[in-house]
Amino acid sequence: MSLFGLSLGRLLEALRCLPGVGPKSAQRMAFHLLESDREGGRHLAQALLEALDKMTHCQTCRILSETDLCSLCADSRRDRGQLCVVEMPSDVQAIEQATSYSGRYFVLMGHLSPLDGVGPEALGMDLLAKRLDTDQIREVILATNLTVEGEATAYYISELAQTRGITTTRIAHGVPLGGELEFIDSNTLSHAFQSRRHL
């Protein structure tokens, strides 16, 4: 129990569910909102509730969207023959901001991790396979993180694509090993994307 009561204790616990937020950071945020910016706290709570109510996943690419078909999938100007596979929705944001890529996406919502019980079915590989079978895709661009799990996931997807005769490329290693796309600077990510290689 918090020294200041149950409400503050619940707030501190709730803030700690965010990535990278430990006890001290949660305490700083909570005290700031309660002592200095109550209006900001109300706005944050309202925006979070609205996002939780309205946001879903695009039925085609699985990015976060307010509609069943996101704006990227609905855009007829995008190249339907290229499909970029990423781990998380934030990776799509990073690529869109840093590159001139104009194809489509598929978001895995993670990576293969047998030790954690994350297999192909948990990542929507059946949906990806269906897209590979029906969407007339010429090239699959693998933009998973350059970690052991990301590489294993990329290899699995390359096998799916290559058995269907689809060219498979991997973003270049301008991104440091162990790096996560959302934290890479725009120039490095742009160079890595332009220098992708065949698998």
From Swiss-Prot:
Gene: recR
Signal peptide: none
Zinc finger feature spans (C4-type): 58-73
PROSITE patterns in the record: RECR, TOPRIM
Organism phylogeny: Bacteria, Pseudomonadati, Pseudomonadota, Gammaproteobacteria, Chromatiales
Protein family membership: Belongs to the RecR family.
One GO process term, biological-process aspect: DNA recombination
Domain Toprim intervals: 81-176
Coiled coil: none
The organism's place on the tree of life at top rank: Bacteria
Membrane spanning stretches: none
Single annotated GO MF: DNA binding
Keywords: DNA damage, DNA recombination, DNA repair, Metal-binding, Zinc, Zinc-finger
Gene3D superfamilies reported for this sequence: 3.40.1360.10, 6.10.250.240, RecR Domain 1
Protein name per the record: Recombination protein RecR
SMART domains xrefs: TOPRIM
Origin species: Nitrosococcus oceani (strain ATCC 19707 / BCRC 17464 / JCM 30415 / NCIMB 11848 / C-107)
Matching CDD domains: TOPRIM_recR (cd01025)
A Pfam family annotated for this UniProt entry: Toprim_4
Role noted for this protein: May play a role in DNA repair. It seems to be involved in an RecBC-independent recombinational process of DNA repair. It may act with RecF and RecO.
